[in-house]
Regions:
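Extreme N-terminal starter segment of soluble prokaryotic enzymes
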Residues: 2-5
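Amide-forming acyltransferase catalytic core, primarily the GNAT-like/NAT-type
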Residues: 14-20, 24-83, 151-244
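Conserved GNAT-family N-acetyltransferase fold
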Residues: 77, 87-89, 104, 109, ...
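A short, internal acetyl-CoA/4′-phosphopantetheine-binding micro-motif in the GNAT/acyltransferase core
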Residues: 80, 92-97, 103-117, 247-260
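Conserved acetyl-CoA-binding loop-helix of GNAT-fold acetyltransferases
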Residues: 111-128, 150, 256-271
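Conserved GNAT acetyl-CoA-binding A-motif
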Residues: 128-141, 272-283
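Conserved active-site alpha-helix within GNAT-family acetyltransferase domains
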Residues: 142-158, 284-289
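Extended, charged low-complexity segments
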Residues: 242-289
């Protein structure tokens, strides 16, 4: 079996979406009574499909996402045999401080075929040197993943998620709206809060307003701020929690290690915005901040 790996195109969106949707055993939605009910895929709205796993849950949102990738946001690859797509990989180049450095992060590796998986990984490894990346990384949730059984993985960082109270504090800071989405701004910056995959991938997902055409997403209160506190700059992304408007999901990019002053500024600003709880994912070595 000869497997070809190539850059994905818009024409591939249907097949890629099918790979992701095949992993969803039951399609559901919340009815007007607030109860979860099983529904056929075809009867769900684009947004209801989105809630099951993001952009690749439908061709419509997948095409929007693919267009963003092809314009330079990331690297989309497909593995095919005789023009039939068996696998998809999506990766992002990110330039961050140590221990990450300049890396190529795998955001998605979707295939049910081991040979296709290996072919996609080999194609990404071949891109490391031309892209001047020192390592290929992938995130896992919980304990060992299937990749631990197949490949030699070296842990770099462990992420912990915390609920932090938003509260007013005696801190002098400046917070202004910042809508510039040029990724060059965070080149070499750390992402001490909200880094689930890589700084670049999170930026392309959160800072770019590519999903405003979905009214349900547009209605969620979202803020992008440039914060200056005690001589340190930070870029803050804050989004209302899906089911609790008094909770917020937070992501922060900084040119230097995270400081107590920046955290205090974020908590104070969030409290003034009406939030009472901040959901923050941080490296376990930095949680004392």
């Amino acid at each position: 079996m000869s497997i070809e790996v190539r850059q994905a195109t818009l024409d591939d969106c249907g097949a890629i979406s099918a790979l992701f949707c095949a992993q969803i055993p039951i399609w559901q939605r919340m009815n007007v009574q607030g109860r979860v009910e099983d529904m056929p895929y075809e009867q769900l709205t684009v947004y209801e499909r989105w809630l099951h796993g993001g952009a690749w849950m439908s061709i419509e949102t997948g095409a929007i996402h693919m267009n963003h990738l092809l314009l330079g946001a990331g690297i989309p690859l497909v593995a095919e045999v005789s023009n039939v797509i068996f696998g998809y990989a999506e990766a992002y180049v990110s330039n961050e401080p140590e221990p990450f450095g300049r890396l190529l992060n795998i955001a998605h590796l979707q295939t049910g075929d081991l040979d296709a998986e290996r072919a996609l990984l080999e194609a990404l490894v071949e891109r490391l040197k031309p892209l001047k990346c020192q390592q290929l990384t992938i995130a896992r949730i919980g304990g060992n993943s299937i990749y631990d059984e197949r490949y030699e993985l070296t842990p770099i960082s462990t992420l912990r998620r915390f609920n932090l109270p938003a509260r007013q504090g005696q801190i002098f800071y400046r917070a202004v709206e910042h809508l510039d989405d040029d990724v060059k701004q965070i080149n070499g910056w750390a992402m001490p809060v909200g880094r689930f995959s890589s700084s670049r991938q999170e930026w392309e997902t959160l800072w770019h307003e590519q999903w405003q055409s979905l009214p349900e997403i547009g209605r969620r209160k979202t803020s992008r701020r440039h914060i200056s506190a005690a001589g340190q700059d930070a870029l803050l992304f804050c989004r209302e929690h899906l089911y609790d408007p008094r909770r917020a999901e937070v992501a922060v990019w900084t040119p230097k290690p995270l400081t107590v002053q920046v955290v205090s500024a974020v908590r104070d600003w969030a409290h003034r915005e009406g939030y009472r709880t901040l959901v923050m994912a941080v490296d376990e070595d930095a949680r004392s901040v």
